[in-house]
From Swiss-Prot:
GO terms for cellular component: chloroplast thylakoid membrane; cytochrome b6f complex. This is Cytochrome b6-f complex subunit 6. Pfam families: PetL. It comes from the Eukaryota. Keywords: Chloroplast, Electron transport, Membrane, Photosynthesis, Plastid, Thylakoid, Transmembrane, Transmembrane helix, Transport. One of its GO terms (molecular function) is electron transporter, transferring electrons within cytochrome b6/f complex of photosystem II activity. The gene is petL. It is a single-pass membrane protein.
Length: 31
């Protein structure tokens, strides 16, 4: 069970990083 929770946390953190990088690159292109 704890492994499943850790996997979900990893996915959320990974997608959060990917989204942050994508938005950052988009903002740089707009500027």
């Amino acid at each position: 069970m704890s492994l499943f929770i850790g996997y979900i946390i990893f996915l959320v953190a990974f997608f959060g990083l990917a989204t942050g990088l994508f938005l950052g690159l988009k903002a740089i292109k707009l500027i």
